[in-house]
C-alpha cells in the first residue's frame, strides 16, 4: 500500500536513495558521485515535515519504493497561466521489487493525490540514458514537455 512517509521510514528511504544515486552515477559519472544520497537522515526528517514537499512510500511490511514530490503554483505571472503543478523530484522502486507493480502503485497514488489537491499537471525529469524510467513514464501516459540540452566542454 502507498502512504505518506514518516520518520520511521527514514532508514529505508536512505537505502533507496543510494540505489537512485547509483543509477544516476552509472549514467553520468561526470555529474553524480558514487555511494551517496541527496539527503542525510536529518535533512530527510526535516523534509518530511514540509507540506509542500510530500514524500510517499510503498509499504507491504517493508518500504519497497518512494516518491518525493514538490508542489508549486504560478499565480498572476505576466507570461504564464495560473497553474498548480506536482513535480516528482524522485521516484524509486527497490531493486528487489522491480516488475511487481510497485512503481505503478506509487505513480497512480501520486497522480490521484495531485488531482485531489487541485493540481493541473504532474512533471518530472528523466536523465538521458535512463531508458527503463523513460519507458515507465510513457506507459503511465506522460509525454515530453520540454528538452534540456547540454554540451560538455
Regions found by a protein language model. Name each.
Residues 22-44:
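Conserved GNAT-fold acetyl-CoA-binding loop/helix
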Residues 57, 62-71, 87, 92:
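Conserved beta-strand in the GNAT
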Residues 114-125:
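Conserved GNAT acetyl-CoA-binding A-motif
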Residues 1-15, 24:
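A short beta-loop-alpha structural element at the N-terminal edge
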Residues 90-93, 99-112, 139:
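Conserved acetyl-CoA-binding loop-helix of GNAT-fold acetyltransferases
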Residues 123-133, 150-153:
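Conserved beta-strand-loop-alpha-helix junction that forms the acyl-donor binding cleft
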Residues 42-57, 87:
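A short helix-loop-beta-strand connector motif used in the catalytic cores of GNAT acetyltransferases and
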Residues 104, 108, 116, 128-146:
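Conserved active-site alpha-helix within GNAT-family acetyltransferase domains
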Amino acid at each position: 500500500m502507498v502512504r505518506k512517509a514518516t520518520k520511521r521510514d527514514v532508514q529505508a528511504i536512505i537505502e533507496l536513495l543510494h540505489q537512485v544515486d547509483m543509477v544516476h552515477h552509472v549514467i553520468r559519472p561526470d555529474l553524480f558521485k558514487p555511494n551517496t544520497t541527496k539527503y542525510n537522515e536529518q535533512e530527510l526528517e526535516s523534509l518530511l515535515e514540509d507540506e509542500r514537499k510530500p514524500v510517499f512510500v510503498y509499504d507491504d511490511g517493508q518500504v519497497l519504493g518512494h516518491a518525493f514530490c514538490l508542489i508549486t503554483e504560478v499565480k498572476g505571472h505576466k507570461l504564464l497561466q495560473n497553474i498548480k503543478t506536482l513535480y516528482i523530484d524522485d521516484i524509486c522502486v527497490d531493486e528487489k521489487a522491480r516488475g511487481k507493480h510497485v512503481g505503478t502503485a506509487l505513480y497512480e497514488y501520486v497522480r490521484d493525490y495531485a488531482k485531489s489537491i487541485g493540481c493541473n499537471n504532474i512533471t518530472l525529469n528523466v536523465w538521458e540514458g535512463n531508458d527503463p524510467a523513460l519507458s515507465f513514464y510513457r506507459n503511465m501516459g506522460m509525454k515530453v514537455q520540454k528538452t534540456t540540452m547540454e554540451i560538455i566542454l
